[in-house]
C-alpha cells in the first residue's frame, strides 16, 4: 500500500506554528514511507477565506521547504463533485432532506438544554413522509447510524470509541446548496486516496462522523492520528501574547527555516536524547508511535538557541541567501564591503537571528554620521589620540592587507606605547565601527577595509580634537 498523507489548512489566516507542525509531521510520515504528500486548501468558509491567507499559507510552506507531490487542491473548485455524491446518498437513503425551520431548531435546542440533555437534532424529517415542493428551502442531513459505536485506532492515542447515540445527523448541504466542511473532507480523502490523516486533536470529535460517512459511501477508511496542542510556556494555549505564532513572522524575525523545523519536530516527538536533526535524519527517524499524547510547551529561548546553532553550522553561503532579505529590509547597500557569506562568519557568534545580524552590520558597508555617545564619551578621549595616530600610521603602512597583519599593527602599537591592548583596541573599535561592540577587532578592521578604516580613524581624531577645544 502506498502511503499518502495530506495537509489541509483553512485559508482564514496565516500559517501558524501549530499548523506548520502538523504539516511537518504529515510530510515526514509520507517521506519516511516513500509515499506522497498532498496540499489541500479547505476554503468552503466563503466569508472568511481570503486570497491573502492562501498566499500566506503557500509562502509558509515554501519557506519551510515542505514540498508537496499533489495540489494545491481547492474545495471550492470541487462543489460539483460533492453535490453529485450527496445526490447519490439521497437516492441511496443514507442522507435526507430536512425542512425544519431555524426557529424550530432553536426551540428544540433550548428545550434539550433545559432538560440537561446534549443538544442534537431529533430526526423529525428523517422519519417524515410529508410532501414538500421542489423549491422549498431545505438542508441535507447525513443519516447517521442510530445504534452501535465507532471505534478507531488513533495512531498516537490508541483506540477511541464514540457511541452513535451521541452523534447528530450532520448537515452535509446547506440551504444555499453549498456542501459543509465535514462532508467535503470525507469526499476529498476518498478521492485523493489518503491513507493517513494526521491532524490536530481538535478534530477528534469530527472523526467518528467522517468515518460513518465513509462507511455509508463504501469508501476505505484511512488511519487517523491526532496531534496534541501547543501551549505557551505558561501552560495556556499558544497565542499572540506568547510572541510570534505565524510562520512568516519567524522568517521576518530572523529565524532560519532549518531552526524552526528542527524546533517543531521536537515539539511533541523525540528520538532518544538527540536535539539537533537534519532534514534527512528527521525523515529517517520519524514515527507516529514516538509522538507524545501530552500538550507541548513552546519555548522561544530554545528556538533561539537552535537558530544560533544553525547560523553557525550551515554553510555561510546558504545562510547568506536568507540574510539577503533582511539586509534589503534595512536598506543597506552592500556593494562596498564584505560578501554576505563573509559577514555571516564575522557576526555569527554574536548574533542569534539574521534580523539582529542585519541591524548590526551597517558600519561594514556605510559610513556613520556620528559615534555612539556612551562609547565615544568613554573611549574617544584625549588620552586616545596618540594610540589612534600610531595605529593609523601602522595600518597605512600595511602592503598586504590581511586580518593577521592588522592584528600585528595593533599589537605593535600597544608594545611601542607600552600600554595594554585595550588602550589601543577600544578607541580603535569605536573609531572604525562607531560603537563599543564588534567582532574581533582584527577581522573587523580587515573587513571594513584599509582606506575606510584610516578615514574613520581620522574622523575620530577630529572628534577628539573638537572635544579638547571645548574643554
From Swiss-Prot:
Motif ('HIGH' region): 9-19
EC number: 6.1.1.17
Subunit and partners: Monomer.
Family annotation (PANTHER family): GLUTAMATE--TRNA LIGASE (PTHR43311), GLUTAMATE--TRNA LIGASE, MITOCHONDRIAL-RELATED (PTHR43311:SF2)
Protein name: Glutamate--tRNA ligase
KW Ubl conjugation (keyword) present: no
Subcellular location: Cytoplasm
Top-rank lineage group of the source organism: Bacteria
Residues annotated as binding ATP: 240
Amino acid at each position: 500500500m502506498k502511503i499518502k498523507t495530506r495537509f489541509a489548512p483553512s485559508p482564514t489566516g496565516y500559517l501558524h506554528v501549530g499548523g506548520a507542525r502538523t504539516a511537518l509531521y504529515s510530510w515526514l510520515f509520507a517521506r519516511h514511507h516513500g509515499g506522497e504528500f498532498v496540499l489541500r486548501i479547505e476554503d468552503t468558509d466563503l466569508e472568511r477565506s481570503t486570497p491573502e491567507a492562501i498566499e500566506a499559507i503557500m509562502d509558509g510552506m515554501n519557506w519551510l521547504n515542505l514540498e508537496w507531490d499533489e495540489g494545491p487542491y481547492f474545495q471550492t473548485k470541487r462543489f460539483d463533485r460533492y453535490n453529485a455524491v450527496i445526490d447519490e446518498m439521497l437516492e441511496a437513503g443514507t442522507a435526507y432532506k430536512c425542512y425544519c425551520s431555524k426557529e424550530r431548531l432553536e426551540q428544540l435546542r433550548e428545550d434539550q438544554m433545559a432538560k440537561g440533555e446534549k443538544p442534537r437534532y431529533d430526526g423529525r424529517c428523517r422519519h417524515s413522509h410529508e410532501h414538500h415542493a421542489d423549491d422549498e428551502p431545505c438542508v441535507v442531513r447525513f443519516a447517521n447510524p442510530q445504534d452501535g459505536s465507532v471505534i478507531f485506532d488513533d495512531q498516537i492515542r490508541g483506540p477511541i470509541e464514540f457511541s452513535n447515540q451521541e452523534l447528530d445527523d450532520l448537515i452535509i448541504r446547506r440551504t444555499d446548496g453549498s456542501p459543509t466542511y465535514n462532508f467535503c473532507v470525507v469526499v476529498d480523502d476518498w478521492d485523493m486516496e489518503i491513507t493517513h490523516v494526521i491532524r490536530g486533536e481538535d478534530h477528534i470529535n469530527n472523526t467518528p462522523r467522517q468515518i460513518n460517512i465513509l462507511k455509508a459511501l463504501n469508501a476505505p477508511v484511512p488511519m487517523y492520528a491526532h496531534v496534541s496542542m501547543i501551549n505557551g510556556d505558561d501552560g495556556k494555549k499558544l497565542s499572540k501574547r506568547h510572541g510570534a505564532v505565524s510562520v512568516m513572522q519567524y522568517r521576518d524575525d530572523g529565524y532560519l527555516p532549518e531552526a524552526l523545523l528542527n524546533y517543531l519536530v521536537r515539539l511533541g516527538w523525540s528520538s532518544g536524547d538527540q536535539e539537533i536533526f537534519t532534514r534527512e535524519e528527521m525523515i529517517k527517524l520519524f514515527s507516529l508511535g514516538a509522538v507524545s499524547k501530552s500538550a507541548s510547551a513552546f519555548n522561544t529561548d530554545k528556538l533561539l538557541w537552535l537558530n544560533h546553532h544553525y547560523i553557525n553550522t550551515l554553510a555561510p553561503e546558504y545562510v547568506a541567501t536568507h540574510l539577503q532579505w533582511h539586509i534589503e529590509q534595512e536598506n543597506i547597500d552592500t556593494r562596498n564591503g564584505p560578501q554576505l557569506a563573509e559577514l555571516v562568519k564575522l557576526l555569527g557568534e554574536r548574533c542569534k537571528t539574521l534580523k539582529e545580524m542585519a541591524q548590526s552590520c551597517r558600519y561594514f558597508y556605510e559610513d556613520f554620521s556620528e559615534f555612539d555617545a556612551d562609547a565615544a564619551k568613554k573611549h574617544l578621549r584625549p588620552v586616545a589620540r596618540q594610540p589612534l595616530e600610531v595605529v593609523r600610521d601602522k595600518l597605512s603602512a600595511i602592503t598586504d592587507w590581511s586580518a593577521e597583519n592588522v592584528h600585528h599593527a595593533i599589537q605593535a602599537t600597544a608594545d611601542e606605547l607600552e600600554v595594554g591592548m585595550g588602550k589601543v583596541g577600544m578607541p580603535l573599535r569605536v573609531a572604525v565601527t562607531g560603537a563599543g561592540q564588534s567582532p574581533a577587532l582584527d577581522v573587523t578592521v580587515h573587513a571594513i577595509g584599509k582606506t575606510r578604516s584610516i578615514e574613520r580613524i581620522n574622523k575620530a581624531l577630529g572628534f577628539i580634537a573638537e572635544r579638547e577645544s571645548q574643554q
